[in-house]
């Protein structure tokens, strides 16, 4: 029997162990998509306790922020909401999480937590209800007194070279500017352009948001569709000046429905007048804006990330109580492969297709995405159109293996830009280590089985590429 999470954790062959320890383990991290706070990076926040880091909670502005993976674990163990997002003391909240964790057998949360405890806190034991007090005291002592345990310290000891945050077009990026001007910050932090609120014409709050966008670009209001595209272009250019390498689109599904500018303008005027738009009208507007944005991304060398097939806020009662991104989302089954291809084809018609990374929350879409990739590659960069890393509910061993196997079967795994945390926690960089172990085990098994040669030079290039080098090239770091 193997020891629990020893140095060969998840590395099931000699080749896998060699690839991981020789090439993967010490590579820098490019965390090109996450949800961490640039303010906390600049201010070099020091957390008071492990519950603040792991469980989050109410923020000073009244919003909720935290790891909703952990919140779902607690809810699934019958923990009352007052211990999850409520006002119970942090020590009690941590106790409830520790009591739930042993139930996570086979769940990546169990591995992630123990990887974090070992790497950052030197704890070699097992977290459960009985050890919670010991772990609480150990972690809090380090968080409060160890200079390497501030936000910047955690990033630096994780060997992170690049962080791509997620930012709204109306954000002034003041914290990014401060980070950029601070010579003591050795890693790069760049904004990512997330214009969902300007695209979701069918959702409540659209007209109000467009009013805010108008103010940011110095207008009283955005009177027509040309004004909208001009405003978005102005904001993209500002983001590019601040070092933006990627955009991100969180879509229910990827639409494609052609329309003239006049049609789209009429739809926009209708929405701004407070009238409801039909699903068909929304798709026409969204398609028009996505094509415009894609062309701007191409011009400015910004990658376009498409996240889709998530059905959000399905528990109406809890979503109304706590708001979005609090753990009430699920995998959707929208079929939009043809629309994705049509969008890329429209951009390709004028040689203005940007680098694109496609993520579906539904793993049933893996093979479809894999076949789309090969239709739109070009000489601009190897792997210009990417199948994004196993996302959200799929960033576990089976999901990661399936995504990489699908990519290997239908495209070039060797050009994959690799892992991202998509996280709100500064301890989550261990997920890159988790991914690297799974990657090396997968490739190592192919070598052990005689399906790929034991070619040291080729294997080094592939492993280092997927761990960091491909992302460095892709995002022009």
Where would I find each of the regions flagged by the language model?
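Metal-cofactor-binding active-site regions of metalloenzymes
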Residues: 2-300, 352-354, 358-370, 374-477
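Short secondary-structure transition/capping segments
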Residues: 43-44, 317-319
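A short acidic, glycine-rich active-site loop
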Residues: 279, 328-334
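C-terminal amphipathic alpha-helical interaction region
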Residues: 304-306
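Hard-cation-handling environments
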Residues: 310, 315
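Short glycine/proline- and charge-enriched loop/turn segments
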Residues: 319-327
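Divalent-cation-assisted or electrostatically stabilized phosphate/pyrophosphate-binding catalytic cores
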Residues: 334-340
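Short, basic/hydrophobic alpha-helical segments
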Residues: 343-349
């Amino acid at each position: 029997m193997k020891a629990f999470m020893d140095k060969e954790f998840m590395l099931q062959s000699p080749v896998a162990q060699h690839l991981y320890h020789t090439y993967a383990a010490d590579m820098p991290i490019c965390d090109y998509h996450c949800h961490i706070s640039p303010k906390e990076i600049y201010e070099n926040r020091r957390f008071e306790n492990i519950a603040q880091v792991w469980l989050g909670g109410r923020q000073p502005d009244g919003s909720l922020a935290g790891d909703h993976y952990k919140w779902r674990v607690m809810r699934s163990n019958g923990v009352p909401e007052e211990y999850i997002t409520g006002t119970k003391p942090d020590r009690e909240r941590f106790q409830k999480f520790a009591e739930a964790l042993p139930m996570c057998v086979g769940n990546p949360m169990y591995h992630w937590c123990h990887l974090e405890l070992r790497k950052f806190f030197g704890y070699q034991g097992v977290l459960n209800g009985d050890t919670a007090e010991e772990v609480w005291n150990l972690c809090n002592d380090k968080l409060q007194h160890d200079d390497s345990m501030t936000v910047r310290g955690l990033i630096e000891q994780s060997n992170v070279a690049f962080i791509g945050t997620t930012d709204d077009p109306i954000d002034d990026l003041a914290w990014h500017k401060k980070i950029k001007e601070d010579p003591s910050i050795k890693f790069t932090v760049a904004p990512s352009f997330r214009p969902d609120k300007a695209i979701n014409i069918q959702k409540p709050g659209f007209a109000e948001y467009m009013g805010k966008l108008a103010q940011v670009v110095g207008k009283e209001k955005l009177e027509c569709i040309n004004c909208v595209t001009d405003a978005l272009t102005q904001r993209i250019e500002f983001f590019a000046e601040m070092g933006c390498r990627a955009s991100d689109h969180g879509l229910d599904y990827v639409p494609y429905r052609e329309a003239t500018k006049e049609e789209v303008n009429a739809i926009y005027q209708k929405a701004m007048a407070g009238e409801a738009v039909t699903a068909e009208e929304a798709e026409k507007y969204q398609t028009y804006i996505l094509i415009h944005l894609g062309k701007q991304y191409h011009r400015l060398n910004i990658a376009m990330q498409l996240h889709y097939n998530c059905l959000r806020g399905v528990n109406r009662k809890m979503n109304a109580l706590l708001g979005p991104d609090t753990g009430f989302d699920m995998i959707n089954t929208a079929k939009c492969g043809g629309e994705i291809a049509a969008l890329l084809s429209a951009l390709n018609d004028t040689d203005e297709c940007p680098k694109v990374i496609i993520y579906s929350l539904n793993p049933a879409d893996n093979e479809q995405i894999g076949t789309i990739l090969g239709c739109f590659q070009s000489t601009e960069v190897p792997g210009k159109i990417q199948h994004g890393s196993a996302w959200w509910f799929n960033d576990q061993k089976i999901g990661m293996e399936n995504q990489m196997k699908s990519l290997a079967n239908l495209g070039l795994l060797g050009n994959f830009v690799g892992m991202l945390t998509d996280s709100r926690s500064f301890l989550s960089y261990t997920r890159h280590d988790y991914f690297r172990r799974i990657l090396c085990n997968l490739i190592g098994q192919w070598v052990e089985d005689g399906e790929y040669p034991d070619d040291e030079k080729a294997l080094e290039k592939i492993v280092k590429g997927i761990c960091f080098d491909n992302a460095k090239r892709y995002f022009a770091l």
